[in-house]
């Protein structure tokens, strides 16, 4: 009985983590740290972003504050796959333990 409760607790926690990783997928944004002044033209902003060590792939000027914002794909696909494999392994181990008892 205690193993079943533990199994369901781990499964629910894993699903919550999986859902959290899924909501973060998409595009990561950050303000360009070396940009000075008002951002009016996209081309210099893109150049500034690509020169950053964070390996940004694109950039654009924000509409209201006119700041240079750098963008890149978030690396959550790998994290999601890893998390899914870990959850599967944990679930299989718990089921195996329940069967042995």
UniProtKB/Swiss-Prot annotation:
Instruction: Report the superkingdom from the record.
Output: Eukaryota
Give the residue range of the signal peptide. 1-25
- Which Cys-Cys disulfides exist here? 28-74, 32-48, 39-61, 45-68, 49-70
Q: Quick check: keyword Signal in the entry? A: yes
Task: Show the Pfam families listed in the entry.
Answer: Gamma-thionin (PF00304)
- Residue ranges of the propeptide: 75-101
Does Cell wall biogenesis/degradation count among this protein's keywords?
no
Q: In which tissues is it expressed?
A: Petals.
> What keywords does the record list, in alphabetical order?
Antimicrobial, Disulfide bond, Fungicide, Knottin, Plant defense, Secreted, Signal, Vacuole
For this chain's UniProt record, which GO biological process terms are given?
defense response to fungus; killing of cells of another organism
Its GO CC terms are:
extracellular region; vacuole
Q: How does activity depend on temperature?
A: Stable under extremes of temperature.
Q: What is known of its domains?
A: The presence of a 'disulfide through disulfide knot' structurally defines this protein as a knottin.
Q: What does this protein do?
A: Plant defense peptide with antifungal activity against F.oxysporum and B.cinerea.
Question: Which family would the database say this protein is a member of?
Answer: Belongs to the DEFL family.
The protein in question is named Floral defensin-like protein 2
The source organism is: Petunia hybrida
């Amino acid at each position: 009985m205690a193993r079943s409760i533990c199994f369901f607790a781990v499964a629910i926690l894993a699903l919550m983590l999986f859902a959290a990783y899924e909501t973060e997928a998409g595009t990561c944004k950050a303000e360009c740290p070396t940009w000075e002044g008002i951002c009016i033209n996209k081309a210099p902003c893109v150049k500034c972003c690509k020169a950053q060590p964070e390996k940004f792939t694109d950039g654009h000027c924000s509409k209201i504050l006119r700041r240079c914002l750098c963008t890149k794909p978030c690396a959550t696909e790998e994290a999601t796959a890893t998390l899914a494999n870990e959850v599967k392994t944990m679930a299989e181990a718990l089921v195996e333990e329940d069967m042995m008892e």
